[in-house]
């Protein structure tokens, strides 16, 4: 019997005689335990919801193609970039960050921008956002961010107080907060926003020469954003507006595109950089490190099944290929373990076998992993009956020394270094970003901030005003006015670290 016949079967192939009526002892009697189809269905239903992502739970995705448009082989020998015109299959997932699976798409929030490239040397995952920076630069704070932006443990409601108490306790968060309160904190849809690798990564070439890089993805649909008022009206009619926009565009053949660029910094330049080049709260200025075009990706195929391809998509920055590498960015280093560990919890130890996660560029038949067994291991015959140890006399599991990476530069002793003693320049870049805004855009930052801080205690509001003022006096004055606070009553000369010391 073929699936096309539409005839109902159980999970193991037996035909189902009655889909609507349970087996009972008599016309009006109780259920019988031998109604195995009912038991099979209800027990499966009880388990069909898998754990949601701790962050980025609400998302949309699509398949597409990446095409190289410019030669960057002087920086990397990664095969994905080996020649102009080369194409690589890929998958992209966009998301909000704070909300749960059922949250509205139009919330003032960061958007996730995760890409999976199926290269011939394995999967390369670039797990980014629609902003080039983040709230902090040490992964030990990540759990607190998650809790602060999600539901309060007592009320089970989102808490602006918790959110802003955390953000304003970290002066380095102002750069990200400024972006979030700007027009770009509410993109019209996933098609109308830029993407960033955010972290500093590295590339190396055939000579073993390493450079530090940042990835940028510029939307070719143009940047479009909503005001808070516009977004509120749309949410009242459609909570899935961004997902619907992406899906419908692809279904209608209006395939969205993004151009990929990199910024490149040499190891010598990094040593002389005025700030820590691996600080996730700061950008590299484009006048010093201009954008270099790399390629373009186009999303041209919607998933056939959302759960199969989008909900079960697993991204981790440890999925990297020869020619590409990490950096000393502490936030990136912290994610190297966390992401894969979360996927093993959410999807199981063999989640690499799920179709969207398979290394399609290599081919499952060509894999030779040392890992075996675990729940639901089936795809590669569990490596068959060959040796499951190394070394062995069959030459299985031999290393590939030709893919050794060049030495990773490090210095110093292992210690819990206070990064604030190394760099307390929290406000220069937020100030420059503010001054780049038009007068109307500045007013919207003030208004958006006031909206977002509704219900927040005055001391937390004052903390934020003080930080804004240190970035630019007009920034602080504008936020104070929008919040209805007399800035002349605020001690603006308080040491910039005082709030953090109190926060600890």
Swiss-Prot record:
One of the protein's GO biological processes: response to hydrogen peroxide
GO molecular function terms noted in the UniProt entry: catalase activity; heme binding; metal ion binding
Binding residues for heme: 339
InterPro entries (alphabetical): Catalase (IPR018028), Catalase_3 (IPR040333), Catalase_AS (IPR024708), Catalase_clade1/3 (IPR024711), Catalase_core (IPR011614), Catalase_haem_BS (IPR002226), Catalase_immune_responsive (IPR010582), Catalase_sf (IPR020835)
Keyword Metal-binding set for record: yes
Keyword set, alphabetical order: Heme, Hydrogen peroxide, Iron, Metal-binding, Oxidoreductase, Peroxidase
Pfam families in the cross-refs: Catalase, Catalase-rel
Reaction equations catalysed: 2 H2O2 = O2 + 2 H2O
EC number: 1.11.1.6
Gene3D superfamilies linked: Catalase core domain
Residues at the active site: 56, 129
Any GO CC annotation of this UniProt entry: cytoplasm
Names of the cofactor(s): heme
Stretch list, region Disordered: 1-25
Top EC class, one word: oxidoreductase
PANTHER family: CATALASE
Subunit comment: Homodimer.
Chain's role: Decomposes hydrogen peroxide into water and oxygen; serves to protect cells from the toxic effects of hydrogen peroxide.
Family to which the UniProt record says this protein belongs: Belongs to the catalase family.
Protein name in UniProt: Catalase
Native organism: Staphylococcus epidermidis (strain ATCC 35984 / DSM 28319 / BCRC 17069 / CCUG 31568 / BM 3577 / RP62A)
Designated gene of the protein: katA
